[in-house]
Amino acid sequence: FDDLMLLLCCRQGPVCFIPLNEWPCSRM
């Protein structure tokens, strides 16, 4: 799971949902 995937996921909303994890987009 890399920065590009996180960036693309964070475009969808304030929280990025991936298997077994949640990434708040404020980390970007």
Swiss-Prot record:
Cellular compartments annotated: Secreted
Processing and modification events after translation: Contains 2 disulfide bonds.
UniProt KW keywords: Disulfide bond, Neurotoxin, Secreted, Toxin
Main location: secreted
Record's GO cellular component terms: extracellular region
Annotated GO MF terms: toxin activity
Tissue expr: Expressed by the venom duct.
Domain commentary: The cysteine framework is I (CC-C-C). Alpha5/8 pattern.
Protein name as annotated: Conotoxin Cl1.2
Native source organism of the sequence: Californiconus californicus
